[in-house]
Curated annotation (Swiss-Prot):
It comes from Synechococcus sp. (strain CC9605). This is Epoxyqueuosine reductase. [4Fe-4S] cluster 2 binds at C201, C217, C245, C248. It comes from the Bacteria. InterPro entries: 4Fe4S_Fe-S-bd (IPR017896), 4Fe4S_Fe_S_CS (IPR017900), QueG (IPR004453), QueG_DUF1730 (IPR013542). It catalyses: epoxyqueuosine(34) in tRNA + AH2 = queuosine(34) in tRNA + A + H2O.
Amino acid sequence: MQGHVTDQQTRLSEALKRRAAEEGFNPVGIARIPGSPRLQLRTKALQRWLDHGHQADMAWMAAPRRRDPRLLLDGANSVLAVGLNYYVDAQPSPGSLKVARYGWGRDYHRVVDQRLRRIGRWLSEQRPDCGWRACVDATPLLDKAWAEEAGLGWIGKHSNLIHPERGSWMVIGHLLTTEPLNADPPARSLCGRCSACIDACPTHAIREPFVVDARRCLAFHTIENREDDLPENIRAALGSWVAGCDICQDVCPWNHRSLPQSNDPDMQPRPWLLNLHKEEIQTWDDSVWEQKLRGSALRRIKPWMWRRNAAAAQPDPTPTL
């Protein structure tokens, strides 16, 4: 009887991953709850990070439910982890301000959530009695740790997930389910002695490997800081970044390989984001902001914050011939 159940689990597990691939997710993997001992170490590391105040004003990071997926879905047994590539081989035009790549396309929260829900409905058709919950990064879940547990990649020293063939340019999501599924092997860290991301951070926000202090992070300050003015040390280091920051990913050797480009329509850049200028942003009012950022994750940055960030940013010099 046990063998029969295991065969059923295997077939369902493989079918579920194929269904996720049909939604454009790659890589995909499965982890069993409560996870391996390494997952428990990640949970303890989160508490140390919180104890040191590295979360800055992001109080939601301390949500107790983040420590146990079963607090998000009663009876949860398994986690389907998925990655969605957003890498497009494009660069901002000379003299323009920079926006983090994840924000170039459609709001990934909506994209990933909608696709996960379709997978969840498919799962309900296969197992009518099972429960499930779609989770994107707004959900209190140790999302990168569970993605690592499911074999999608390892957490790099810059705290982003790295896949050996796809680099770190991917957003992730999870489908919690009460269905017992077959787990994939956890990913193994391949950062070795590399310190490129630590060395490149202009504000030394990566305090030590795997520990990012949001209080020093350009991405945090351009997206989450609700103060009228940015701190002086952030203004001095901002450079041309106006929404997020990709420096630690740009220098990562795993992103210097020949990476597959996303042909997903939802991940393609809005052209104006690659030709964004200081003077233009400083004239934005609410209506312009609404028109430009409809359906974008960058709506997290309110109009006055765009103007504040643009005032502090300095475009890279235009190359001369």
